[in-house]
């Protein structure tokens, strides 16, 4: 099982990624990051069923759980 964190989970692509990872049999969504959706359920933010995973406000919070891959779909700050 590959453990995935999605940064930018409340954006258009981030929501698609959350739904795709949640539906995949060989992937596990272990973190989702979106300041605007912090504390809400990642599945519900993505427009799907609840996943029992709260969205983190920062990447550091999400990385407190071991992960294998971080997919970053955040807006550049430069």
Describe every region a protein language model picked out.
Residues 6-10, 14-19:
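N-terminal Rossmann NAD(P)H-binding glycine-rich loop of SDR-like oxidoreductase domains
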Residues 23-48:
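NAD(P)-binding Rossmann-fold cofactor-contacting core
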Residues 49-53:
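Surface-exposed acidic, glycine/proline-enriched linker/cap segments
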Residues 54-58:
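Short acidic-hydrophobic, aromatic-tinged amphipathic segments that line or gate anion-handling sites
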Residues 59-61, 65-78:
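Beta-loop-alpha module in the N-terminal Rossmann-like domain of NAD(P)-dependent dehydrogenases
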């Amino acid at each position: 099982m590959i453990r995935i964190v999605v940064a930018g989970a409340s954006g258009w692509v981030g929501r698609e990624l959350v739904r795709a990872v949640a539906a995949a049999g060989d992937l596990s969504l272990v973190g989702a990051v979106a300041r605007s959706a912090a504390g809400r359920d990642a599945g519900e933010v993505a427009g799907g069923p609840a996943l029992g995973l709260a969205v983190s406000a920062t990447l550091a919070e999400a990385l407190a759980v071991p992960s294998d891959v971080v997919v970053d779909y955040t807006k550049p700050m430069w």
